[in-house]
Amino acid sequence: MPRKGSVPKRDVLPDPIHNSKLVTKLINKIMLDGKRGTAQRILYSAFDIVQERSGRDAIEVFEEAINNIMPVLEVKARRVGGSNYQVPVEVRPERRTTLGLRWLVNYSRLRGEKTMEERLANEILDAANNTGGAVKKREDTHKMAEANKAFAHYRW
């Protein structure tokens, strides 16, 4: 906790091509070592691949994919009487989008395709069709929350 009050929340600027803050956040997640130009090139190439393969607008497919990835529930560890319980809690909207983007990028990086553009495009298409690693992660998170429903009364 900072001594001098809370730190102000910084807002991201919408990206110049699609005018979307969500796209900017995804670029920031893809970016490594401050190389924003490389991250933008990867994302826009991936969007071109998505549009080509799906025949729909890439932003629509991307937003559908993110909605399929974002978790509603997660578990948090809570210590009660000397033992740790996995307590299911609802995920705040800001954290939902952050987790969705993080999982999308992480599971894209784990894929087997040759270039990052192809990996990201295929993960977005898979997520839009409710398949793929990122959607599986969301399902696993929900299963954990469901399995620990008995400890829901420990919520704080």
UniProtKB/Swiss-Prot annotation:
* Pfam families xref list: Ribosomal_S7
Any one Gene Ontology BP term: translation
GO molecular-function terms, A-Z: rRNA binding; structural constituent of ribosome; tRNA binding
Do you know which Gene3D superfamilies this protein is assigned to? Ribosomal protein S7 domain
InterPro entries per record: Ribosomal_uS7, Ribosomal_uS7_bac/org-type, Ribosomal_uS7_CS, Ribosomal_uS7_dom, Ribosomal_uS7_dom_sf
Provide the alphabetized UniProt keywords: Ribonucleoprotein, Ribosomal protein, RNA-binding, rRNA-binding, tRNA-binding
Q: Where is the signal peptide?
A: none
Q: Which PROSITE patterns match?
A: RIBOSOMAL_S7
Give the GO cellular component terms, alphabetically. small ribosomal subunit
Specify the domain of life of the species encoding this protein: Bacteria
Matching PANTHER family, A to Z?
A: RIBOSOMAL PROTEIN S7
Functionally, this protein is described as follows:
One of the primary rRNA binding proteins, it binds directly to 16S rRNA where it nucleates assembly of the head domain of the 30S subunit. Is located at the subunit interface close to the decoding center, probably blocks exit of the E-site tRNA.
- Record note on quaternary structure: Part of the 30S ribosomal subunit. Contacts proteins S9 and S11.
User: Which HAMAP family does this chain map to?
Assistant: Ribosomal_uS7_B (MF_00480_B)
So what family is this one in? Belongs to the universal ribosomal protein uS7 family.
Protein name as it appears in the record: Small ribosomal subunit protein uS7
UniProt organism field: Staphylococcus carnosus (strain TM300)
